[in-house]
UniProtKB/Swiss-Prot annotation:
Catalyzes the dephosphorylation of undecaprenyl diphosphate (UPP). Keywords: Cell membrane, Hydrolase, Membrane, Transmembrane, Transmembrane helix. This is Undecaprenyl-diphosphatase. Its EC number is 3.6.1.27. InterPro entries: UppP (IPR003824). It is found in: Cell membrane. It is an enzyme of class 3 (hydrolase).
């Protein structure tokens, strides 16, 4: 049952800007069990597949453009790779520290508050100047740096990248697309690196399937909320979650 619940939590919260890793750590604390970082990473592969389906047209468009040596798509792919580098660096060199944070509900509560603040600010950002193809390389790097902070449980990956993209003047729909696209190598890498620690029990595989299905729902919801200017709802939720964690866990 625990694996099933964690699968639902991962699927829904991976793309909603409320921190999936933070919620997985919270529910692990509620269950009074040891954080299974390997299983958490396995669930990331489920949400990777959900994103791949959700942005399949953009992925095929990029692959097709690169195969035709279209400079515009080659540049876009290069920017996505650049956005990924900071998170990969942090994951490889600070993995032990990150794993230790999963056991600190106090830090998770603080980080959730930070995510809440970013979501309240995001709704006020509406420059609508740049598309995913027109953003400069420097902007791509900045978004990547923000994503790197999301390796900490409580700091939302989608929340930080959406905030950064909107702050830098990207159109809302393009900010969503860019956030989803740049999540692909990160979630895939996180899953593959820890795959050897997964038991592949029936419960874990079922949790994987549930995480995939709820991930698709989460993707749809966050796209609607960003375009509709309702990210502040997630901000208020993060404050409530932070209060709960700091008070009761």
């Amino acid at each position: 049952m625990e694996e099933l619940i964690l699968g639902i939590v991962q699927g829904l919260t991976e793309f909603l800007p409320i921190s999936s890793s933070g919620h997985l750590a919270i529910f692990t604390a509620i269950f009074n069990s040891t954080p299974d970082v390997g299983y958490f990473a396995f669930l990331h592969l489920a949400t990777f597949l959900a994103v791949l389906i959700f942005v399949k047209s953009e992925v095929f468009e990029i692959i097709n453009g690169i195969s035709k040596k279209d400079k515009e798509y080659i540049n876009l792919a290069s920017k996505l790779v650049l956005s990924t580098i900071p998170a990969v660096f942090v994951g490889l060199f600070f993995g032990d520290f990150i794993e230790s944070v999963f056991s600190s509900t106090y830090l998770i509560g603080i980080f959730l508050s930070i995510t809440g603040i970013l979501m309240l600010l995001s709704d006020k950002l509406n420059k609508n100047l740049k598309t995913i193809k027109s953003i400069p390389y420097f902007d791509a790097l900045i978004v990547g740096v923000f994503q790197a902070f999301s390796v900490l449980p409580g700091i939302s990956r989608s929340g930080t990248t959406l905030f950064a993209a909107l702050f830098l003047g990207m159109k809302k729909e393009d900010a969503v697309k860019y956030s989803f696209l740049m999540s692909l190598p990160v979630t895939f890498g996180a899953g593959i690196l820890e795959l050897h620690n997964v038991a592949f029990s029936t419960e874990q595989i079922f949790g994987f399937v549930i995480s995939f299905l709820t991930g698709l729902l989460g993707l749809y919801l966050v796209k609607r909320m960003v375009i509709g200017g309702k990210l502040k709802i997630f901000g208020y939720y993060c404050f409530l979650a932070s209060f709960f964690v700091l008070t009761f866990l």
